[in-house]
Amino acid sequence: MSPIRQLRSLSELEELALSKVPGGDFGGDSWREGLDVLFNAIRNEAHINRIGVRALEASIDQFLVNRLQINQWYRDHPEIEDETIAMPVFSVGMVRTGTTALSYLLDQDPENRSLIHWQAMAPCPPPETTHLHDDPRIAEIEKKMPLTGMATAKKEMIELLADGPAECLHLLGMEFKSGHFEGMFNIPSYHDWLFATDLRPAYHWHKRALKLLQWRAPTKRWMLKYPSHTMALPAILDTYPNAKFIATHRDPARSIVSVCSLVHQGAGALWETTDFAYLGRQWTKIVEEQLKRMIAFRDAGHDHLFFDLHNDELVREPMGSIERFAFYDLAQKAYCIVQTGERRFYGDFVFKKGVIAP
């Protein structure tokens, strides 16, 4: 039997998720379009093997169950909606530009809070401050992470820890508008749809998840990373009007070679055959579109929201890079103060009105 014939139907996967959350409600049907497009692409384009079928079903089940559970928590505790996400910082840019290393460095600052793997993959029940580092889900997620070929390959090229910073794919996946799937499978029609669709509903659920995660664990500033955020900058700013961005940079040719290698080593275990030409074309297209969208967004009056960091600088002087970002943020705060005519000291510097602009 062909592996694709073993794939459960959408109705079967929906029923499976609902059986795990009795009385659950998906909170609308906006997610269905993305899942329909994904399923059609998988059946007609992906050429996945049995491992790929299991990995796909597991991802779909996780996203549906998380959506059901989050919606249930909001229904039982409507006060969660009153949570405020204060000045989140999104790491954006091309794939393979150092966002993972950067996220681990930024996560050391107690003022920051990263989206952590175990919280992204199993957000319910929402974590509490007193158990952020000893929640039993940490050990459970740690066992699951190496089970797929993708996770194993990533561990060789990227540090992945259950209690370490995660990409936002798990939150956006609840709307099935996530680059997660094009990183797993060769599905050009889903990719084209994702390029053209409205991503704001996905960030609505992204925000719902963050509010839930900080409801019992108050947060000063979220540090969020995912190269696919670069494709959705207007949607992010619509959802988070006070957002700021760290843009990471690298020679595009090296970035493309690196991501093709990563995808092949990881997701290649999910395919019946490997189409290297497709990988090269597809990721060149993705990187080109990421750059075009970021340039257009910055040129549209949003350049002041960005802090730029080149991969070479991050590798050569990681702490210096972080200090430069921290000082930049401090300078912006100081400028806001001196605009009122007030003078304050920051370290060895005195900021005076009009001297430093954000």
Cite the ranges covered by each PLM segment:
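Conserved acidic-Pro-Pro-aromatic motif
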Residues: 323, 327-357
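Glycine-rich phosphate-binding P-loop
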Residues: 90-110
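Long, basic/Gly/Ser/Thr-rich N-terminal segments
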Residues: 1-78
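PAPS-dependent sulfation machinery
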Residues: 121-222
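Post-Walker A helix-loop "phosphate-sensing" segment adjacent to the P-loop in P-loop NTPases
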Residues: 108-118
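Membrane-proximal basic amphipathic "stem/tether" segments
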Residues: 1-4, 11-12, 348-358
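Short, glycine/charge-rich beta-strand/loop segments that flank catalytic centers
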Residues: 74-96, 119-125
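PAPS-dependent sulfotransferase catalytic domain
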Residues: 71, 75-77, 82-83, 196-221, ...
